[in-house]
Regions:
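Short, well-structured alpha-helical interface segments that form or flank functional binding sites
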Residues: 4-7, 23, 63-66
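Amphipathic alpha-helical segments
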Residues: 2-17
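Short, compact, well-ordered microdomains
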Residues: 55-74
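Acidic, low-complexity, intrinsically disordered interaction modules
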Residues: 18-61
Length: 74
């Protein structure tokens, strides 16, 4: 069975931030201040650590791609 983006991010140690999900943003955050934010209206996402751009792993990219698919972006 294929995992959802939320499940994939959880497996990578991210927590879903419900406060950000108001049909405008979706945020996943790690304890180390890494965050992945999807801005739904603008159809963009960002990955940062301590408010600075961050390199991502292949597994993070897979989770990001899955979230983009679920949002209908790709």
């Amino acid at each position: 069975m294929k995992m959802t983006a939320r499940e994939m991010f959880k497996k990578l140690g991210y927590k879903y931030n419900k406060c950000r999900d108001r049909n405008q943003m979706i945020e996943y955050r790690k304890e180390d201040s890494t965050s992945v934010i999807f801005c739904i209206k603008e159809r963009v996402f960002s990955v940062s650590e301590y408010c600075e751009p961050k390199d991502i792993t292949v597994d993070e990219l897979k989770a990001i791609n899955q979230q983009c698919k679920e949002l209908g972006w790709i």
